[in-house]
């Protein structure tokens, strides 16, 4: 399903103006810590869902997709079941680097299974204002009527503008409005870590 004609979403740090200085403040998670966190989260999801029979993961492009795939792989190691993984592509319209304009639009979906009656878990890398998640949930309910929709994020950085809460969180980080949580994954970035950076005018 596609809304058509919209540019793909880019990470905030990819849209940094050339005159803006970025200062790395520290590493939040190493590659090993990311792997351990995803293993823990996989166990938490299976336990809370009462198994994997009606469970499916929906990764939000871009970095939510490899995270969802890794969690599904960890679940396969828990009970030997192949948990299906779908993809949602959300376009964000930004009016500056720190605030998202009122529009967050579902651009496309790649979900090859029915969602009716399913226990769905949305997976994203960073939870910030909540606008992306709201658009993702709207898109899911356009596809059908899942039994339950939960949210799993690697990092919750606060500053919510929507009444959105993650049920499964890798790590909660207190941030300022000028700071950016930068997630890098080997499938996309050829390196693996989570950093906290600050932008200076």
Question: What name fits each language-model region?
Answer:
Residues 1-201:
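PRPP-associated nucleotide enzymes
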